[in-house]
């Protein structure tokens, strides 16, 4: 590939790329458009950043999301109007799920905008700020760059994205992108601790009194990961014998192979043992917890505030008393120090068993959801990155314990089906040394399958499992089991990788345990190529956790008039 010729003068576009590289971005996703082409030349010529073109802008946004979850930041480039709006669903998902993505939008030159003429990719009314106003609802920071303040505004948006762990939006006109400027004079300012010493001191006093000599239990969620304070939480967990659980959103946040791991807490949909351990804990620490409908069993959690220490991003509470400003990492370190200072070791506790060991099915046994996820979990190895789409794949996997060193990615709040396929591309590029395992349903795959060829082009070798249950099974479980709107077109799935340009791959169609076992054995052996497995399961078969969750959803009143859990949080 011939690199484009770039003028020697340093530009605003180069400044933006150098700042992204400084934050750890080595790939930028997107789809080219005429308002971005010159900026793309700078990307191609950049010494450390590569361009990764996608099949469409929505997929580019999903890929950037998957990359950002593992790298801590990501970027995509789309063109004005038509391109950015195609990516808006993905950006909204990143906002909902606290993923830092920088969305760079190429726009017409400023002088053309000033004429207020009906330029292509606009609404034709001469107003070129419609879309930045839309973006303000789904990003934490926005900038319409001008030549006078471009570099300052770039730094502001990137700093806000890094601080809030949410997307940012940069509108980059073609003339501003090529405008001369100076390279960064210094690195972006790092994180400054926003904790008040007085708030921390009062928090320690209150927490010490509540904890006393009682056993502590921890319930953790995804904000611990997004705010990069996992080590601080692990220090707390090793300061004593501390049982812990996570919500579905925080799955794989902590070691699930530990004898202290309780399992997944999902309110009334939890196992009885996990529910009792969390809801009856003498002292419960909730770290980075956000109760959403689907991860809490439709808000059926029973958490008593009087026995709870809640640790949030910028504030913490002990019982009914709030302490702010107090950053999460500082609060977790303080709790660990309290356990160390008290010098009382809690006795071991009886915890629920891990994945139950069932009898190995016969090779001719027809596959079910339970057999599929049992066998898949047994095939995982440390280092795998598992992406489970928001369907039976997600709920089938979350109730299984993962090996240490496996990362799990799902999207239970935004829940945009098809998200995980392009996100797996981004995750694979974020950590090339870790093999991705992609799990999604047939209906979800039909939305984003165009990106499959990009895996081969980028030299990635994922294991892809498409669950063929002949349509939208979760919707069938909620309403309309035989309704035509829950049907989809039937595809020849094993032909698709080759049709989309994946030259080096192995495809399997598994209806029995023996066929599934063979496919996974080949996947374990062939680590340098894509292994694509179509798995046939009954149309109305559900994982047990999903069965528990869909009971309240079957009553439409429960969807919109959710029960009051009886506690404040």
From Swiss-Prot:
Binds 1 metal ion per subunit. SUPFAM superfamilies: DHS-like NAD/FAD-binding domain, Thiamin diphosphate-binding fold (THDP-binding). Belongs to the TPP enzyme family. Pfam families: TPP_enzyme_C (PF02775), TPP_enzyme_M (PF00205), TPP_enzyme_N (PF02776). PANTHER family: PYRUVATE DECARBOXYLASE, PYRUVATE DECARBOXYLASE ISOZYME 1-RELATED. Keywords: Decarboxylase, Lyase, Magnesium, Metal-binding, Thiamine pyrophosphate. Its cofactor is a metal cation; thiamine diphosphate. This is Alpha-keto-acid decarboxylase. Gene3D superfamilies: 3.40.50.970, TPP-binding domain (3.40.50.1220). Mg(2+) binds at residues 442, 469, 471. The lineage of its organism: Bacteria, Bacillati, Actinomycetota, Actinomycetes, Mycobacteriales. GO terms for biological process: aromatic amino acid family catabolic process to alcohol via Ehrlich pathway. Thiamine diphosphate binds at residue 57. Decarboxylates branched-chain and aromatic alpha-keto acids to aldehydes. Its EC number is 4.1.1.-. One of its GO terms (molecular function) is thiamine pyrophosphate binding. One of its GO terms (cellular component) is cytosol. Residues 392-474 are annotated as: Thiamine pyrophosphate binding.
């Amino acid at each position: 590939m011939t690199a484009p010729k770039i003028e020697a003068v340093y530009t605003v576009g180069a400044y933006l790329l150098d700042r992204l590289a400084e934050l750890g971005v080595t790939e930028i996703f997107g789809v080219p458009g005429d308002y971005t082409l010159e900026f793309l030349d700078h990307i191609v010529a950049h010494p450390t950043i590569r361009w990764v073109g996608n099949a469409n802008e929505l997929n580019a946004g999903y890929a950037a999301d998957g990359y950002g979850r593992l790298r801590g930041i990501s970027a995509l480039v789309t063109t004005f109007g038509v391109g950015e709006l195609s990516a808006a669903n993905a950006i909204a998902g990143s906002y909902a799920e606290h993923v830092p993505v920088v969305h760079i939008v190429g726009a017409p030159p400023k002088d053309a905008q000033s004429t207020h003429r009906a330029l292509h990719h606009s609404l034709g009314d001469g107003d070129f700020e419609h879309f930045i106003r839309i973006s303000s609802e789904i990003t934490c920071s926005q900038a319409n760059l001008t030549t006078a303040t471009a570099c300052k505004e770039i730094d502001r948006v990137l700093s806000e994205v890094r601080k809030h762990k949410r997307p940012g939006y940069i509108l980059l006109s073609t003339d501003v992108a090529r405008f001369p400027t100076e390279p960064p004079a210094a690195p972006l300012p790092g994180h400054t601790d926003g904790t008040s010493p007085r708030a921390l001191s009062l928090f320690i006093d209150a927490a010490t009194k509540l904890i006393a000599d009682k056993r502590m239990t921890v319930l953790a969620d995804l904000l611990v990961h997004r705010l990069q304070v996992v080590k601080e939480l692990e220090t707390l967990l090793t300061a004593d014998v501390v049982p812990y659980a996570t919500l579905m959103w925080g799955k794989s946040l902590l070691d699930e192979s530990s004898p202290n791991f309780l399992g997944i807490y999902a309110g009334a949909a939890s196992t009885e043992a996990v529910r009792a351990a969390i809801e009856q804990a003498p002292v419960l620490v909730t770290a980075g917890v956000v109760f959403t409908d689907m991860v809490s069993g439709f808000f059926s959690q029973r958490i008593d505030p009087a026995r709870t220490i809640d640790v949030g991003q910028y504030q913490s509470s002990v019982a009914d008393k709030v302490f702010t400003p107090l950053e999460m990492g500082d609060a977790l370190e303080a709790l660990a120090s309290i356990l160390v200072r008290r010098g009382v070791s809690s006795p071991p506790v009886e915890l629920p068993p891990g994945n139950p060991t069932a009898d190995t099915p016969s090779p001719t046994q027809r596959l079910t959801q339970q057999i599929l996820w049992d066998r898949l979990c047994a095939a995982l190895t440390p280092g795998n990155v598992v992406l489970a789409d928001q369907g039976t794949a997600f709920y089938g996997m979350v109730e299984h314990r993962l090996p240490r060193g496996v990362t799990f990615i799902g999207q239970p709040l935004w829940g945009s089906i098809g998200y995980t396929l392009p996100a797996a591309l981004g995750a694979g590029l974020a950590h090339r040394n870790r093999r991705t395992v992609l799990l999604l349903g047939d209906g979800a795959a039909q939305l984003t399958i165009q990106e499959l060829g990009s895996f081969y082009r980028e030299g990635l070798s994922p294991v892809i499992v498409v669950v063929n249950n002949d349509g939208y099974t979760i919707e069938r479980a909620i309403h309309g089991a035989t309704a035509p709107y829950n049907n989809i077109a039937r595809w020849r799935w094993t032909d698709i990788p080759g049709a989309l340009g994946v030259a080096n791959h192995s495809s399997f169609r598994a209806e029995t345990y023996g066929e599934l076992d063979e496919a996974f054995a080949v996947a374990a052996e062939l680590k340098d190529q894509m292994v694509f497995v179509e798995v046939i399961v009954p149309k109305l078969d559900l994982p047990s956790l999903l069965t528990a969750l869909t009971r309240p959803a079957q009553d439409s009143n429960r969807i919109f008039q959710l029960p009051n859990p009886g506690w404040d949080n």
